[in-house]
Amino acid sequence: MDFLKEEIERKRRQLEGTSELPVKKAFRRGDWEKEREKKYLQEKQQKDEQRELKKRKLEEERLKYEEKKLRISRLANKESSRNEELLTETTTPSPAVKASPASTKLSVSENDRLSIPEITKDNLTLTEIIAKLREMKEPIRLFGESEEATIQRYYSLLKYKKLEEIENELLTKGVETIDFEHATTTKPKVSKQVVAFLQHGIRIWDNFLSSKSINSFESSESQMQLKIFRQAKQDLDVLIQLIVDEALNDDIFKSIAEICYRCQKHEFVKANDMYLRLTIGNAPWPIGVTMVGIHERSAHQRLQANPSSNILKDEKKRKCLQALKRFITFQERESSNLPEYTD
């Protein structure tokens, strides 16, 4: 009878997969502890292997991302150099080394709608241009580059140097103070001031994130900051386009101008207060709800007295204003490193 019971127990353990311990009526505690320790070590080894595999995959993805980013930048550089060569072939009237008097000025479009001084082409010889390139610590001749392409590259570098000087001047002196009180009377002037301030702030935000090392972006917080910046930049570009096209009414534009002015003066409490008045207005419902009952109320008409009330109903404007709020948050967080604008 005992033999039959032991055989049944052994078969049951085989079916359950728990036949590590011998089928006995009794066993020592030390054997049980050894078996438990063995299972624990096996599970720990499996978890370590999974962790190492996950870490290896993340490292491979990061390397692929960096390689892709480097490849895209190289392709962009090649494309820009190819465009410059094509532009040189179409705009250069003759293969002369000296620039002709008819083309003494290089047409430079406004960069980011800021005033950029024109770059004049002096009658420099190729030897003088090579000397200038050496002073700028740039290669005097690229592979397969013609003399005309060298001259064009020099003036392109000169243009970028001028833009860099303007950027440095903006970083040290700051942009013009926004005259938000006359936003309705002198709207074109104030629009230019607001656009210049927003673009300058976006550049500072971008430089702040670019100055961080690659290792710092491994944390979830840094990745979230980068994601917020990309989305905010995209929506702020839409807001800038709305301002340039004068697609905003005077009340909304004046409120945005005042928000930017308060950021210039580092008055972030007033800037946030103005943001709340712009987004919510006189309405007590921040999500656009204006009716909570079936009966019309006298106070409901007063809720719509301010044209900016319930502005969050418009999805496009809501995203723009959300990006503006994130812009205010960044300015407030980095206010110690940003210059205060003076009249």
From Swiss-Prot:
<keyword id="KW-0539">Nucleus</keyword>
<comment type="similarity">
    <text>Belongs to the PRP18 family.</text>
</comment>
<dbReference type="Pfam" id="PF02840">
    <property type="entry name" value="Prp18"/>
</dbReference>
<dbReference type="Pfam" id="PF08799">
    <property type="entry name" value="PRP4"/>
</dbReference>
<comment type="function">
    <text>Participates in the second step of pre-mRNA splicing.</text>
</comment>
<feature type="region of interest" description="Disordered">
    <location>
        <begin position="80"/>
        <end position="105"/>
    </location>
</feature>
<dbReference type="GO" id="GO:0000350">
    <property type="term" value="P:generation of catalytic spliceosome for second transesterification step"/>
</dbReference>
<dbReference type="InterPro" id="IPR039979">
    <property type="entry name" value="PRPF18"/>
</dbReference>
<protein>
    <recommendedName>
        <fullName>Pre-mRNA-splicing factor 18</fullName>
    </recommendedName>
</protein>
<dbReference type="GO" id="GO:0005682">
    <property type="term" value="C:U5 snRNP"/>
</dbReference>
<dbReference type="InterPro" id="IPR004098">
    <property type="entry name" value="Prp18"/>
</dbReference>
<dbReference type="GO" id="GO:0005634">
    <property type="term" value="C:nucleus"/>
</dbReference>
<dbReference type="GO" id="GO:0071021">
    <property type="term" value="C:U2-type post-spliceosomal complex"/>
</dbReference>
<keyword id="KW-0508">mRNA splicing</keyword>
<dbReference type="InterPro" id="IPR036285">
    <property type="entry name" value="PRP4-like_sf"/>
</dbReference>
<dbReference type="GO" id="GO:0045292">
    <property type="term" value="P:mRNA cis splicing, via spliceosome"/>
</dbReference>
<keyword id="KW-0507">mRNA processing</keyword>
<dbReference type="GO" id="GO:0046540">
    <property type="term" value="C:U4/U6 x U5 tri-snRNP complex"/>
</dbReference>
<keyword id="KW-0747">Spliceosome</keyword>
<dbReference type="InterPro" id="IPR014906">
    <property type="entry name" value="PRP4-like"/>
</dbReference>
